[in-house]
């Protein structure tokens, strides 16, 4: 093993409470839906690609509107997460410090562009990671982005740590 590639949600932090509130605010402001998103709902959806999440949450809307709404949810989510860092998992920085001594660290997640950067900025953990990718950056799903990280950084024996 020469490197570790982490997912973000459910692995490094739990942003679901903050995101749920931001998404619910968008839904109530911009739709006629009486839908309230909670952390449990998001835990069941995170890990999927955003268009898939949009089709679940906004099934009654045309595809174009689904994508617009999920984009708005993500914009509000970024603002909320920049204002308040989501809870990090216990001893995360200490663990990353220890891992960084022997392994190269990366992040790959099925999220929108900017989300990983928000995590790195608000958590202050950016110095531990050499690189990161997501579908919002590449248009590719997690598996393809993991392969891209492996190729770009010439990793020989990486492991992936995540819940999906």
Q: What kind of feature is each model-predicted range?
A:
Residues 2-93:
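N-terminal helical cap/lid subdomain that shapes the substrate entry/recognition surface
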Residues 3, 142-164:
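Conserved Lys-Pro-Asp/Glu-containing loop-to-beta segment of HAD-superfamily phosphomonoesterases
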Residues 11, 109-111:
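Conserved phosphate-coupling serine/threonine residues in phosphotransfer and NTP-handling enzymes
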Residues 23, 54, 92, 116-120, ...:
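Hydrophobic packing residues within well-ordered alpha-helices of enzyme cores
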Residues 41-42, 125-140:
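A short, structured active-site edge motif that brings together acidic residues
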Residues 79-107, 117, 143-144:
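Short, acidic loop-to-helix structural element flanking the phosphoryl-transfer center
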Residues 104-106, 131, 159-161:
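A structural signal for isolated positions on well-ordered beta-strands in alpha/beta enzyme cores
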């Amino acid at each position: 093993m020469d490197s570790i590639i982490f997912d973000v949600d459910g692995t490094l932090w739990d942003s679901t409470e903050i995101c749920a509130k931001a998404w619910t605010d968008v839904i109530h402001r911009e739709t006629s839906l009486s839908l309230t998103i909670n952390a449990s709902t998001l835990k069941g959806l995170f890990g999927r690609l955003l268009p898939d999440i949009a089709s679940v949450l906004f099934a009654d809307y045309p595809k174009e509107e689904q994508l617009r709404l999920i984009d708005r949810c993500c914009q509000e989510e970024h603002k909320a997460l920049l204002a308040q860092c989501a809870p990090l998992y216990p001893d995360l920085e200490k663990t990353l410090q220890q891992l960084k001594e022997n392994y190269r660290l990366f992040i790959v997640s099925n999220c929108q562009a900017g989300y990983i950067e928000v995590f790195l900025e608000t958590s202050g953990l950016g110095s531990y990671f050499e690189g990161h990718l997501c579908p919002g950056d590449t248009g590719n799903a997690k598996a393809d982005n993991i392969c891209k990280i492996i190729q770009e950084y010439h990793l020989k024996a990486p492991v992936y740590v995540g819940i999906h």
